[in-house]
């Protein structure tokens, strides 16, 4: 079976065929580092980490680029609010992002460009758009993109161009030609970062950043562009308008977008106070539990977060690990179950179905090659299912375990069972095997 991916551009699943055989170039919009990462970041990061790893598992060489937005209105406003230097703010938050992503099993991108490092490329791209007649200047404001000049504007979000260029939008800037015209270069304001440009001192708009960085690092066209569904419009729509107008080339072949995270059936947002940071969750849950929670839902569907749903994921994950810890090691691979796993993943990264295959494998009493197959699946899932956890056993529990061992040697089974119940009440299970007694945290 060939990998099929849902392409937002065509609104259908398509067979994935890279531009260059066995080689994939992929760009995913990274975080704006105005704050620490939240559960929405975790979902996007895990989604595209899974895609990247599965592509590698399928035999592709992958060049994975994910940017860091380190200059933007949110960052400037946050720095003003805290009275902190912008560079210090972004470096501190970037460190938090990278640390937290690592704890949920996400690998660093092959290239992780910062927007501030590519301003010359952004200026060059705006100049090319200007030469082709796609831009205009609003005095004391900035350089804008005229969306009416790009005939395919709206094709990614499946909106009619004529609806997007009308000026009926309330509060639209009076000087804008069309309601969806967007800024390419913002003229500098007091106490804000700036760079020299042909239009005067200023800084790049958000949309031009990704267009310039992806073109410079990957070249056009490239295979996959990813991000959250909230980026489809206007961010990714505007990227297409910029890049295709400037280069006269197709920008991207496959557009892949992950669904949003709701908290107790309400969209997660700071203003509602239902905002969950990765760091807060890691106080109570292992990073791999968060990863398990994310892959338990299909990446395109919205996922509802609550304490109970994460507790359910924790219980399922720990049960799975406990079952696997009792399996005998073997190098054999069960081709039947591995094919089922591949078939699920090839169907637009159907991770919940692939997870069900894993559960079916470990529960199948007659299946051979379980550990060998799990090792293959782990190349994509990276749930640390085979990692032995070192558990700290309290002294009181150790004494009970030792007493039970003595009762077993004396064949005092009744007292041994009583001690087992006391150990379990303390939160630990004991399993008597041919290799000795194994103790696990319940």
Features from the language model and the residues they span:
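Alpha-helical recognition segments enriched in aromatics with Gly/Pro capping
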Residues: 1-32, 49, 99, 104, ...
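N-terminal, positively charged nucleic-acid-binding surface of large information/translation enzymes
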Residues: 10-13, 19-105, 430-439
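Short, well-structured beta-strand/strand-turn elements
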Residues: 61-63, 133-139, 365, 429-431
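Phosphate-binding beta-loop-alpha motif at adenosine-nucleotide cofactor sites
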Residues: 109-117
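Structural preference for alpha-helix termini/caps and helix-kink/transition segments
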Residues: 267-442
């Amino acid at each position: 079976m060939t990998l099929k991916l849902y392409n937002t551009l065509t609104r259908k699943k398509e067979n994935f065929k890279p531009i260059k055989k066995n080689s994939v170039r992929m760009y995913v919009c990274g975080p704006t580092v105005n704050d620490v990462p939240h559960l929405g970041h975790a979902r996007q990061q895990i989604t595209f980490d899974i895609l990247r790893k599965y592509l590698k598992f399928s035999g592709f060489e992958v060049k994975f680029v994910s940017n860091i937005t380190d200059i933007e209105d949110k960052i400037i406003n946050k720095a003003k609010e805290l009275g902190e230097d912008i560079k210090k703010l972004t470096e501190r938050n970037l460190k938090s992002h990278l640390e937290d992503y690592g704890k949920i099993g996400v690998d660093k991108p092959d290239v992780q460009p910062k927007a501030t490092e590519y301003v010359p490329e952004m200026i060059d791209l705006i100049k090319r758009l200007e030469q082709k007649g796609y831009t205009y200047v609003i005095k004391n404001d900035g350089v804008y993109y005229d969306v009416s000049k790009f005939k395919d504007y709206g094709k990614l979000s499946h909106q009619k161009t004529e609806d997007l260029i009308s000026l009926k939008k309330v509060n639209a800037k009076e000087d804008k030609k069309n309601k969806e015209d967007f800024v390419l270069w913002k003229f500098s304001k007091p106490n804000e970062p700036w760079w020299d440009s042909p239009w005067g001192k200023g800084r790049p708009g958000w949309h031009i950043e990704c267009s310039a960085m992806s073109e410079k690092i990957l070249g056009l066209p490239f295979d996959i562009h990813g991000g959250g569904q909230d980026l489809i419009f206007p961010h990714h729509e505007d990227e297409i308008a910029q890049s295709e107008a400037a280069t006269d080339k197709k920008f991207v072949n496959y557009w892949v977008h992950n669904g949003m995270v709701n908290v107790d059936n309400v969209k997660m947002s700071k203003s509602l106070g239902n905002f969950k940071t990765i760091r807060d969750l890691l106080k109570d849950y292992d990073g791999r539990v968060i990863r398990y929670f994310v892959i338990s839902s299909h990446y395109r569907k919205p996922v509802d977060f609550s304490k109970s749903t994460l507790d359910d994921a924790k219980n399922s994950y720990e049960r799975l690990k406990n079952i696997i810890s009792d399996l005998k090691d073997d190098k054999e691979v069960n081709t039947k179950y591995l094919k089922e796993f591949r078939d699920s993943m090839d169907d637009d990264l159907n991770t919940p179905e692939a997870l069900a295959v894993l559960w079916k494998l470990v529960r199948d009493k007659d299946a051979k090659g379980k550990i060998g197959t799990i090792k293959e699946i782990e190349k994509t899932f990276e749930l640390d299912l085979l990692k032995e956890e070192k558990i700290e056993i309290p002294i009181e529990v150790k004494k009970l375990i030792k007493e039970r061992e003595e009762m077993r040697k004396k064949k005092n089974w009744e007292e041994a069972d009583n001690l087992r119940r006391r150990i379990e009440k303390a939160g630990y299970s004991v399993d008597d095997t041919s290799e000795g007694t194994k103790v696990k945290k319940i």
